Amino acid sequence: MAVTARNQRVAEEMKKEIARIIRDEVKDPRLEAGLVSVTGVELSNDRHYAKVYVSIYGDEEARNQAMEGLARATSFIRREIGQRLSLRYTPEITFKLDVSIEHGDHINRLLARVRAGEYADE
């Protein structure tokens, strides 16, 4: 799937706007339990579908609650995106949990343990 320059620009604008909407306008207490960061947006070639990757700081319960809150707010967020960005078609939004930051942190901790001489398997 080739990513066009237009899709990249639209995805970046969507990322910024969705982050603003979640931070400033969505009033769901489930989203306040964990810190939600939008890490990326992946658009389909026809720009009808968008996968929004989010990183949620907190324990497993906070992540689950935040994902439920995002699922409930999806139609509101989509409507706001449609009003703020001049797109022919407002993409259907799907939120996906991005665990790459946590995975990278785990790798860094393991490397630090190896450097410190702790060779225990994990």
Curated annotation (Swiss-Prot):
PROSITE patterns: RBFA (PS01319)
GO biological process: maturation of SSU-rRNA
A Pfam family recorded for this sequence: RBFA
Transmembrane segments: none
Places the protein is found: Cytoplasm
Keywords: Cytoplasm, Ribosome biogenesis
Cellular component annotations (GO), alphabetically ordered: cytosol
Protein transport recorded as keyword: no
Molecular functions (GO terms): ribosomal small subunit binding
Domain of life: Bacteria
InterPro entries linked to this entry: KH_dom-like_a/b, RbfA, RbfA_dom_sf, Ribosome-bd_factorA_CS
Subunit structure, interactors included: Monomer. Binds 30S ribosomal subunits, but not 50S ribosomal subunits or 70S ribosomes.
Sequence similarity: Belongs to the RbfA family.
Function: One of several proteins that assist in the late maturation steps of the functional core of the 30S ribosomal subunit. Associates with free 30S ribosomal subunits (but not with 30S subunits that are part of 70S ribosomes or polysomes). Required for efficient processing of 16S rRNA. May interact with the 5'-terminal helix region of 16S rRNA.
Stated name of the protein: Ribosome-binding factor A
Organism of derivation: Moorella thermoacetica (strain ATCC 39073 / JCM 9320)
